[in-house]
Amino acid sequence: MQHNAGFTRDDVVMAALEIGVDRFTMGKVARLLGVSAVDLGRSVSSRDDLLVACLERVSADITLPPAGLSWQKYLRQLADSLWDVLDANPGLDHILIDLAWAYVPFMSVAKRAHSALVSGGLRSEDAYLALSCTLSTVLTSHRQAA
């Protein structure tokens, strides 16, 4: 195996995302980067550490609908945006459904979406319910369609 000492944590995250968040192993990531699994320890402490980093990356890349929309239009565009994120990240639907803690890196996105729904005319508690229903529907539909 060729030793690639120049890789970064970002390289490790991108390799894991390329493999798929539900399918990557430390060995597969190391092979893709041309390093040993032990070398990955310089950038990530465990598979869970890498999974959290992947989820944080995906969360940071989510494009929410523009502010100022009615709550109905916002939810429709949000559902489309979430579907696109799931399409771009194979296995993400499985991870978000199967791992109880996997939603945590997405909380700041959810808070921004909640604020937009309230600004669009929903009461706060209704906005939480609408987000929960929309996310559940998109996740389960995407998982079934895959």
Regions picked out by a protein language model, each given a short descriptive name:
Residues 16, 90-94, 111:
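Glycine-rich, often proline-containing surface loops adjacent to acidic residues and nearby aromatics
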Residues 1-28, 32-35, 56:
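Short, amphipathic alpha-helix enriched in basic
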